[in-house]
């Protein structure tokens, strides 16, 4: 399964990239499951992101989504902090 991941704001600096394509050996059903797989495979910052995921927003193909919404082959995931304004 191929997915494109986009990071914004502090996540970009934390992980050292703003976008990256991943090829996974198995199907992933949700953004939450994707983070779980990444945390098991890479540890470190991925574990922290998985544990803190509710502090961040996720979009699937540029549509604001939930961590439990379905994802499919070739989808684009974007993870970013909540935006505030004034």
Roles of regions detected by a PLM:
Residues 1-85:
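Ubiquitin-like/PB1-type beta-grasp interaction modules and other compact soluble beta-rich domains
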